[in-house]
Amino acid sequence: MFKGSIVAIVTPFNNGQVDFEKLRELVEFQISNGTDAIVPCGTTGEASTLDYDEHMDVVKTVIEQVNKRVPVIAGTGSNSTAEAIELSQKAKEVGADGVLLVTPYYNKPTQEGLVRHYTAIADAVAIPQILYNVPGRTGVNMLPETVARLAPHKNIVAIKEATGSLQQASEILALCGDKIDVLCGDDFITFPMMACGAKGVISVLANIMPKTVAELTDAFYAGDMEKARQLHLQTLKIGNAMFIESNPIPVKTALGLMGKCSDEVRLPLCPMGAANKEKLAAIMKEYELI
């Protein structure tokens, strides 16, 4: 259902407020460069520091600007099941094509708790739902066997797998077959994960290099494995640079250096340190981004 290069778009700020004009410009930058779908209010979109009204206004703005040209998948995850249901229902009402649901963070549910959490959301809201496993940020790893229990639900269509583990992604693919799509959640293994059967990537790097990430996934689907492999290797250095500090600090800093939007982030995130900013700028110059 969702495939190819899917950008986890940043939420631009200006003096503490969401910069909706810049958000619309970023959407156009993505679509004009071949991005296949857009995820507002994910990790990269700083969803955890948006209030409810801001969250929904960002989702609505992206949906309006996209105007059905590509799918919009709203980040609606929460560590409160009730809140995740509320956000998902609202996203459906405003026209989202799907929702992305991060595993509950901080409260560390058991695997049974994860099954009940996602089943409750899928039963309550009839919209395509993407599970999102990112244990490095949440403190809980959703095991392949747990994904297999959820995969048959008609509203659960995919998982964003961001453990960085090809083994775990492969186990999900082996256990679930065609019951659920797998999307790569780590830019540095997009090509190898697609070779295992993933349908695409939910990408941080696509914020600054949308054309290149789209070319990689397009090449894979066209059967041009050599081109996809070369793009995979060529983008490793810049992709790794997106994580020299906590995401989305580097990618917002990069967008700032490119003049696309302010590099402003919300506390407790803070501006990138001078040494890392210098390092990032040097790498961006190598890629002729600035």
Swiss-Prot record:
It comes from the Bacteria. Pyruvate binds at T44, I202. Pathway: Amino-acid biosynthesis; L-lysine biosynthesis via DAP pathway; (S)-tetrahydrodipicolinate from L-aspartate: step 3/4. InterPro entries: Aldolase_TIM, DapA, DapA-like, Schiff_base-form_aldolases_AS, Schiff_base-form_aldolases_CS. Its EC number is 4.3.3.7. GO terms for molecular function: 4-hydroxy-tetrahydrodipicolinate synthase activity. Keywords: Amino-acid biosynthesis, Cytoplasm, Diaminopimelate biosynthesis, Lyase, Lysine biosynthesis, Schiff base. Disulfide bonds: none annotated. PROSITE patterns: DHDPS_1, DHDPS_2. The record marks T43, Y106 as: Part of a proton relay during catalysis. It is found in: Cytoplasm. It catalyses: L-aspartate 4-semialdehyde + pyruvate = (2S,4S)-4-hydroxy-2,3,4,5-tetrahydrodipicolinate + H2O + H(+). GO terms for biological process: diaminopimelate biosynthetic process; lysine biosynthetic process via diaminopimelate. The active site is at Y132, K160. Pfam families: DHDPS. Catalyzes the condensation of (S)-aspartate-beta-semialdehyde [(S)-ASA] and pyruvate to 4-hydroxy-tetrahydrodipicolinate (HTPA). NCBIfam families: dapA. Belongs to the DapA family. PANTHER family: 4-HYDROXY-2-OXOGLUTARATE ALDOLASE, MITOCHONDRIAL, DIHYDRODIPICOLINATE SYNTHASE. Homotetramer; dimer of dimers. This is 4-hydroxy-tetrahydrodipicolinate synthase. The gene is dapA.
